[in-house]
Amino acid sequence: MTELEQKFINARRQAIALDYANLNDMQQQGTMATEGPLLLLAGAGSGKTTVLIHRVANLLRYGRGSDTDEIPIPISEDEVAFLEAYAAQPTPEQRPLMQYLCAVEPARPWEVLAITFTNKAANELKERLERMLGEEARDVWASTFHSACVRILRRDIEQIGYSRDFTIYDTDDSKRVVKDCLKELELDEKTFPVREIVSVISRAKDEMLLPEDFRAYWEKNNDWRKIRIAKVYSLYTKKLRDANALDFDDIILLTVQLLQSRPEVREYYQRKFRYVLVDEYQDTNHLQYLLTSLLAGGYRNICVVGDDDQSIYRFRGANIENILSFEKEYRGARVIRLEQNYRSTQN
């Protein structure tokens, strides 16, 4: 690398960093480290949502410009001098040229998948991105796990034997179907409570245990009660399939099965999503871990944000091991800790 090229790269990073001058050092690093696997460890009040929003904005404005030594355009001393002057005293008139010089393959909005755990968090992400970037932010895939999977299934579920107009069953629907199954199998609800069976089926799906696998496991262990629950699980699955219906767990399970079994579908989404971001990663369960691994398997540009000290979703099968083993799963991953607590500071 020539001295001129090094000066340009340094000036480019300084110019981009001005966009995030209101962030602290670690937040700025989390925003500008765009390439490869990244683990952001962030407790409550550390500004992680702000980092996620700035990170997406950075990807759309500059692509990998803040995290590469690549120079895709011819440069001279003039470009270096311009960026150095901009970094010292920026003006609005200079901004278009600055963005042109600093951008390296900026991501298109639909190439960014940002997954959150709640609709409220997803909507907040969309609203704040739109305020920052305008209408183009609407095309970012900012959604919950279930919403993202429904979009994928509406496009491709026919490849695994369902029709695209599938119905989604809520918890009450699932309980109703389980009740019907118990009645058909002549099993007493007092011995086999509906809520318990719904929970057992949900956990089985999270572990990708299909009815036949579930039954074989408990037959091997000679568990009379679980063998009967396996019969309920099998009949429950048949009833949903006959109705072209999915329960909440099926939405993610079938998406994972689709991506695993159909290489062309998997490759389509791996090409589509250049950048995958996952919030509250410590709360992901086994299926959600598999899903994000599959979707990020093309570019490996996956950024996960989480707190390694808490897991409020443990009752839903959350596996905190997903965050603790991230560096082992993704060789070469960078780890950044957002340790300053702004809520405490404000108090």
Task: Identify the meaning behind each predicted range.
Residues 119, 180, 310-347:
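Conserved coupling/interface region of RecA-like P-loop/ASCE motor cores
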Residues 58, 280-286, 310-314:
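Residues immediately C-terminal
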Residues 22, 89-98, 145-149, 227-275, ...:
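Conserved helicase/translocase P-loop NTPase motor core
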Residues 36, 107-111, 136-139, 298-301, ...:
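Short glycine-/polar-rich loops that comprise or flank the Walker A/P-loop
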Residues 30, 34, 117, 136-140, ...:
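ATP-hydrolysis module of ASCE/P-loop NTPase motor domains
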Residues 272, 280, 307:
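Walker B catalytic acidic pair
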Residues 1-163, 168, 267, 321, ...:
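P-loop NTPase Walker
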Residues 286-301, 318-325:
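Short, conserved "post-DEAD/DEAH" coupling segment immediately C-terminal to helicase motif II
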